[in-house]
């Protein structure tokens, strides 16, 4: 997206500053530091990354939000973006046993029925995921 000239904001969240991953890599790609949140307040916003996202969404319009991480956090983020009618793509971290859709160990409940994360995902439209 950045190489295509799109404006991109990245929000990273972790329990502590030491647990933040890829901060330098995102800085190199973005040309500026990503937004960061730490649960303990040791770096950036003191609290969850959803707090940062909520603040950002109040400052300017967004065409899309993409999210990965723990499902409870993604659910919370999707509640925020859904209330603002912002399309949201989520990457679900499901265990994939076979990787070809045969074993059904990675199914995700959606408004269109069950989808296999390994074949149909792992990125899904958050509005279609049944939490």
Locations of regions flagged by a protein language model:
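Local cysteine-cluster metal-coordination motifs and their immediate loop/turn environment
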Residues: 71, 93-122
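Short microdomains enriched in Cys/His and/or Lys/Arg
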Residues: 119-131
């Amino acid at each position: 997206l950045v190489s295509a000239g799109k404006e991109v904001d990245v929000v990273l969240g972790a329990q502590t500053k030491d647990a933040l991953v890829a901060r330098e890599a995102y800085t190199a790609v973005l040309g500026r530091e990503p937004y960061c949140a730490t649960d303990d307040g040791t770096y950036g916003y003191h609290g969850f990354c959803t707090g940062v996202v909520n603040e950002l969404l109040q400052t300017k319009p967004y065409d899309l939000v993409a999210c990965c991480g723990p499902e409870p956090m993604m659910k919370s983020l999707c509640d925020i973006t859904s209330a603002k009618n912002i399309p949201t793509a989520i990457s679900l971290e499901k265990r994939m046993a076979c990787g070809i859709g045969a074993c059904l160990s990675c199914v995700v409940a959606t408004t269109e029925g069950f989808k296999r994360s390994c074949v149909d995902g792992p990125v899904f439209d958050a509005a279609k995921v049944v939490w």
